[in-house]
Structures are given as C-alpha cells and as structure tokens.
Amino acid sequence: MAVVDDLAPGMDSSPPSEDYGRQPPQDLAAEQSVLGGMLLSKDAIADVLERLRPGDFYRPAHQNVYDAILDLYGRGEPADAVTVAAELDRRGLLRRIGGAPYLHTLISTVPTAANAGYYASIVAEKALLRRLVEAGTRVVQYGYAGAEGADVAEVVDRAQAEIYDVADRRLSEDFVALEDLLQPTMDEIDAIASSGGLARGVATGFTELDEVTNGLHPGQMVIVAARPGVGKSTLGLDFMRSCSIRHRMASVIFSLEMSKSEIVMRLLSAEAKIKLSDMRSGRMSDDDWTRLARRMSEISEAPLFIDDSPNLTMMEIRAKARRLRQKANLKLIVVDYLQLMTSGKKYESRQVEVSEFSRHLKLLAKELEVPVVAISQLNRGPEQRTDKKPMLADLRESGCLTASTRILRADTGAEVAFGELMRSGERPMVWSLDERLRMVARPMINVFPSGRKEVFRLRLASGREVEATGSHPFMKFEGWTPLAQLKVGDRIAAPRRVPEPIDTQRMPESELISLARMIGDGSCLKNQPIRYEPVDEANLAAVTVSAAHSDGAAIRDDYLAARVPSLRPARQRLPRGRCTPIAAWLAGLGLFTKRSHEKCVPEAVFRAPNDQVALFLRHLWSAGGSVRWDPTNGQGRVYYGSTSRRLIDDVAQLLLRVGIFSWITHAPKLGGHDSWRLHIHGAKDQVRFLRHVGVHGAEAVAAQEMLRQLKGPVRNPNLDSAPKKVWAQVRNRLSAKQMMDIQLHEPTMWKHSPSRSRPHRAEARIEDRAIHELARGDAYWDTVVEITSIGDQHVFDGTVSGTHNFVANGISLHNSLEQDADVVILLHRPDAFDRDDPRGGEADFILAKHRNGPTKTVTVAHQLHLSRFANMAR
C-alpha cells in the first residue's frame, strides 16, 4: 500500500499558523496600575475592592500584594509601600514578589490613582476571559470523557454549569474560614431583627407559617406533600402568588401535571376570587368579568414564569433555572410534582430515582441560592389510619421492619435491634453494599417509627429470616424489588463476607478462650457453681489455663454428682453475698444467669480483629461443634449446634468475618426447647474453615483427616451460584464479541444457575461491569423458600447515606429514602375524606420537618373553589 499526498496544489501541509500555546488573556500594565493606585490612595482601595478578588490577578505576585493591601485596609491600618512590604515580609512573601523595590515600581508606573476603578475593570474583564478559557478547556475534557463512556446527560449538565459559573462570576472556594462567615451571619441576624423577625427570604403569604419558618430561605429545599386531590398544587401556586404578585420577586413553576392555561386559570381564580368551576364552564357574571379584567391588568407585570414542558428531566430544569437566575434574578422555584419527573437513566428502583431527584433539587437550591419547593405525593399510609393524618414516614417510598430486626454495625461489628436504636437515639455506621456489590461502611443518619402495618416473615434457603412489610425492597439481580413482588424461588442478596469493624479492640486471649468455652459448653446460673463440661482432657487443660485470667481455676469436685469441673476462685473464699471474679466477669459480658437457649456472643467478641474471631470460633467449635469426614457420602460434615437461635445467628455472623457463608437448620422438639444447627457446606468453605479456624482438642485429628480428603475429588453441591438470569447477559456479551467457545457453550449449562466460577471465567473474557461485580462482589444469592403473613406490628425504618441499604438479620435490605428537604409541609384536609367532618373548610399545614426551627401544625382555611388557601382569623 502506498501513501500519497493528496493535498490540492497550493495547499501547505504545515500545521495551522494559529498559536495554541499562547498566554491566557491578561494585562500586566493594568494590574500594576491597580496596585500602584491602591498604594497611593485609600479611596482607590475602596473603588477596587468591590470589583476584584485576589484570583483575578494573573501574576501570583500581584495576588499576594493585593491580598496584603486588603488585609491592612480591613484592620484599619495604612496600606502604603512601607506597611505592605512589612506585611509581606511577615508572611514570608516579600522576596517572592520581588522585594520592597517592586512595590515602588508599582507606584511609579501608575498614571493616576484616580483611575484605579477603571484599571480594575480591565483586570476583571481579563480574569473573566481567562475563566472562560479554563471553562472551555474543561468542557472539551468533558466531551472526550463522554466519548469514552461517561454519561452524556451528566457531561452536558457539567458543561452548562461551567459556563454558568463563568457568567455568574462565582469563583467560590471549597472552604471558607469561620472569621469570613461571622460578619455576614451577624448582618443576617440584624436584618431579621430589624424586619420584625422575618428573614430576607420569600414570604409564603401565611402569617402563622411565616412566623415559624421566617419565610422560604435561599438554598432551602421545601417539600409540600399530600394525597391526591387535597390541594398540594394549589399551595405551591399560593407561594408563587405571594412571591411574584405581592412582593414582585421572580418565581417559576415547572409543571409536569398541569398545562400553562390551567395554571393561569387557577391564578386568576385565586386573585380575582372567581369560582374556578364558573371560569371553566363559562358561567361568569358581569361582576366576575369586571373583577377579572381589573385584576388581570394589576398582575400582568408580575415576574411569574411557567414551564409546562412534558417529560422534563433534571438536567433541563437546571439549565432553565440557571438562565432565569441570570435573566430575571429568580427568587423561587416550584416543581410540580416530584414523582412525575424522569431521568432518562436506568436506576435500580424507582425509589432511588426519586431520591436522586430530591438530592439534585437540593443541590440546585444551593447553587442558585433560591428556595426550591417540590410538590410530592404521599403513599397510602394516611388512608389506613383512623384520623387520616399524614406522617413524615408516608413521604418515603420504602417499607418497614420490626423492632426486633438486627442491623449489622460497621463500627463495632455487632448487631443492634431497630428498637434499641430508637430508644438510644444512636446513629451508627453500618455495613452496606455499594454499586460494585462490595461491603462498605456508611452512616445510618436516621431511624424512625412508621406506624403499625401488616408484616411478613421471609425465610431463605440458608435459614436466614427477616420480618418486613410488603413494600420493603430486597435486592434481586435485576434490582431492588418490594417483598410483595417476591415469590418462592427468587434469588436475593445476602452478604457472603463482612470486613473487620472500623474500631477493633483486641481481647486478652485467655479471656477469649474462656468465653468461647463457657458459651459452648458451660453453665453459669445463679446460686449454682460455674461449671464447664469438657469434651476431652485437652479442652479441660485449655480452660484451666485460660481461667487464671479471672483468678479462677478449673477444679473437679470429689463428690459423684458433680461429674464436671467447677470454675471458682483459686486462692481465697469470698464473703457471703459477694460474686466471684469469674461470675462478675460473665455478668459484665451479659452472660451470667443465661441458660443454654438464651446464650449469645458478647459485643466484645465482634469488636475483636479477625485473627481473634478465628481463635474464638476454634474453641467454641471444640465445645459445641463437630468436624468429621463422611466416607459413605464422600463429603465433609462441619456443623455447630445449640438451642439458642440468637447464638446460631451470632456464629453465622462471625463466620462471615473469615469469609465463610453458613446454613441454618431447625429441629423442633416437643416439650422442650427447639434446637438449631449451623452447617458449613461445600469443599471450598470447609477447607477455608479448617485452615483459618480449625478445632481444638481431640477433634483436631478428625479435622486433619477431613482436610486430607478434601484435597481429592469430592462431592460439591452447587450452593454458591448466581441467578440463572445472569446467563442471558453473559450470552449476549459473548455473542456480540463472537466468543461462544466450547467451554461456555455447553447446551445444558444455560439451563441451570451458574456457579460463581463460571461468571468469573466469562468476566475474564468479556468487559462487562455487571458480570465483573457478580463474579467478584460480596453478595451471596440466596433463595426465597417461604413468605408468610404474621399480622400487624409496629414497624420502623432507617436511612443510610449514599448507598441506601444495610444488612439486617444477615440479609441485604433497602433503606427508607431520607428526603433532602430542609422543610417538609404535609397537607391535611379533614373534609377530603369525610364531607361531614366538623372541621369542614379547614386545612392543616403539618410542619413535619424543619431543619432550622420548631415543628408545628398551622391551621388555615381552604377555599379550593377559588383555587387558594387563606389565613384563618386570629
């Protein structure tokens, strides 16, 4: 193949003549004149400081000089060549700017200090152009990022934000010192006091509501929520009428529900006090027409904007709001309503998508420094109550859990019940699955009651159980799915391993061993000797050594009925009524007086690092577990038994710390306590247990034999498998890459759930993020085997920041979606549910959340026939 030059005659093949390496826009002479004028005249400083910031100067030396001048001027000290040189020297910057002689150079170059303000305008223009160049460079980078797979909508939005920041001259820092914030805050407090308690915000038009909230403040997100037909859109328009018609401040409504004509008709009905039904039907009287014409002329100049574009996305709302902020000094945004918004993206659930809208609206409020009112629809919770009053929990989309549900903490490694979190008010770090299906620590920022609802018990093939309402989402391969939509045979996520807690605390090994022995095979009842029943002499020796930590000794009593050793003080007798050190130690751990079916693992063990967790499990297994090889079936048997379900769950949780997933079986017993067994299945997990945990005492020999047998070919049940639907994704990707080789094209293979090794092999051949996460993530895909209603119970939920999920009872569950709102107003109208209600004509604004003040219920009059709410007579 030949390479030829196909340029036309006369065309030069040299690079373009434009110099792409030229300096950014700047005017050093103007910068020097500005600084020279400021050094000569205090009046010049006053003219310049409102126009320039240190970052507007191109030369870093000029930035330092300008900053020093402003600092001296702010302290009331003179700012001349001598004092500025001293200030720069104190900061260690004098040599960097060229020494004291350079300050005199600045003074000598200024034509006249009287024109310093004009010179500052030149510097500001050049700074604006530089920022435009910088923004353009970043936009180009965003464009290339979009070509390489970044989300296009996000790229466009970031590009718009860059240009908006340039036009708005907002070069904000990521952090601001407290001293720079104190005076503006004092000014705001003074303004509030001088205006009779009303902040410089947007008045809602409702006297009592404004008294509580001090108006709608810049940067706030306000949610107005109600059931359909109660009047939430009307209230949003009332806020806009107060803002734009009464106070002549610009407002905009992005309406996804009503058309422009419907909105204008409602506004005219409210302002002219004409029945909306008469306007719609054309039955207006002459007086109505007169009032309408008069009011139209009065409100026609109101800076009120309406956008009824269908299928509005968050990106479009941001772009339009930014333009209005520049064009009309926008003061209020209303979005009607939240659940009708679309994103154009694929989210794991609608709940997460709505939560993202909420978060972006809050960010928009902060960016534009205006209040954003988001209209939202409540779930059916109010209709199920006798008084029909809405609660904050009705605003959330997720389901609820019972008080006994245990949440896995990331700070201590232990579990804590929802009910306990409600009582204590604690908000701990919890383990959560991120988008890569990896366990990460995230804060649980809220825990709250959700009333009394029907609860279902969901049981998995592994024996794990959780009690939740039908609306609570569980994680399937396809995404988060409410319990009511799950069916037997579905696969949902549970953690296959859990990291060490954030705050690990080592225990003395002697205490750890004694604790494991006492939990596994000990007795510590009140008014009885503390006993331990060893399986063999090696285990008795371990207890004898470890008991010394609490000044105790394992002593075999001589009388026949004793049969087992007692743990008691080794040296002295205690006065009557005093606990032994061993009993006091067990009581401090919450184990003293616990019977076998009440035992559990203390929090101190969960706090221990993983090597100590393995040591604890080794001695616990020696006391109450079994490890053996089954030659008949050609597989290993590893299990632990107890009459305490809580203890079994705790052991299962500890096994996750060493990367082992276990299975729980139930053995009912008539006339006694049921028993439970925890099994470790599969050669891979059994080998891991034997190598990283092991057993102590006589069973150690059996464990070595079992490990030897597991090195050969053994029966291995395919328990650790991925959902069968993953094959569709694998096949599509392999087919697209023409990689359907013999290893992954066996006809029978596609009919069954793949073991984790197969997606792992596929992931090595195809570049698919979902397959990668499935093959390497921390999610175990357990199978639903039973869903049973257990009646109505009081339920609770929580909110986890960022990832929006947590581990409860060993299962990954979605959380409630915390609203990002600063203010939540729940609208309640008694006669909406009962026309004969004695409070007919009244409505309640329930201020359910108020980040900067108290909550309260404000009663107003509803005049929905006039499309408005009104203040009640006081």
Curated annotation (Swiss-Prot):
Keywords noted in UniProt: ATP-binding, Autocatalytic cleavage, DNA replication, DNA-binding, Endonuclease, Helicase, Hydrolase, Intron homing, Isomerase, Nuclease, Nucleotide-binding, Primosome, Protein splicing, Repeat
Annotated region (Disordered), positions in chain: 1-25
Catalysed reactions listed for this entry: Couples ATP hydrolysis with the unwinding of duplex DNA at the replication fork by translocating in the 5'-3' direction. This creates two antiparallel DNA single strands (ssDNA). The leading ssDNA polymer is the template for DNA polymerase III holoenzyme which synthesizes a continuous strand; ATP + H2O = ADP + phosphate + H(+)
One of the GO biological process terms: intron homing
Pfam families for the chain: DnaB (PF00772), DnaB_C (PF03796), Intein_splicing (PF14890), LAGLIDADG_3 (PF14528)
MF terms in GO: ATP binding; ATP hydrolysis activity; DNA binding; DNA helicase activity; endonuclease activity
Residues in SF4 helicase domain copies: 195-462, 612-874
Function (record text): The main replicative DNA helicase, it participates in initiation and elongation during chromosome replication. Travels ahead of the DNA replisome, separating dsDNA into templates for DNA synthesis. A processive ATP-dependent 5'-3' DNA helicase it has DNA-dependent ATPase activity.
Family: Belongs to the helicase family. DnaB subfamily.
Name the record gives this protein: Replicative DNA helicase DnaB
Source species of the chain: Mycobacterium bovis (strain ATCC BAA-935 / AF2122/97)
Gene: dnaB
